[in-house]
Amino acid sequence: MILQLHGGGYTGAVRNAYYVFAGLYNELSHGCNVLTPDYRVAPENPYPAALEDALASYRWLLSKGYYGEQIILAGDSAGGGLAMALCMYLRDHNMPVPGGIIAMSPWTDLTASGESYETNYEKDPLFGNTKESLIYQNDYPGEHDRMDPYISPLFGDFRGFPPMLIQVGSIEMLLSDSVSVAAKAREQGVKVRLSVYEGMFHVFQMAYLNIPESKKAWAEAGKFIDVLRTDSRL
């Protein structure tokens, strides 16, 4: 079972693109079911609404008989960060953690403190060259501290996490979010595969199978799922 948490900066609802993502996950996993909740978003529903809805979806899967290790959390951008935040919450509250996490260009640092926010500022075709993007103008945290690990997982503890696959483009401003999380998680004993795709932009996997880099990334995700299947009944 794959629980897919969509991106959109915590302000955009689920889009048709994520149904395509769901189909790809289903195909690459050789038939895994995929649940894509349309979680509440800001500004009407700031933190912790998205986390609460992700948790409710996970609890629903457990109520249907799935074990934690049978569930893979998958997410892109905000959804990737939300997947990590959910895993932290589950661990912190003694609930079953998932069997793995797939994070595509995860947004893990809502303080925008990473080096790549500066070095890729003029390179990033989506968020670059402006301070008016969702990276800087975002209502999700509300009155809460942006360094809260349930908002910015980078500042949390990754001990007890399952294996993670993290994919990111080399020219996106969120590059540091992935690199820093991978380094920290590895230091804390987590198995992490970090794949930096040269010349790629934020969530380039939305090109589906139409460009070589995206095709390779989806194939990598499929192989990661295959590895996890050897240790659980996905």
What do the PLM-derived regions correspond to, one by one?
Residues 1-234:
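Alpha/beta-hydrolase superfamily serine-hydrolase fold, recognizing
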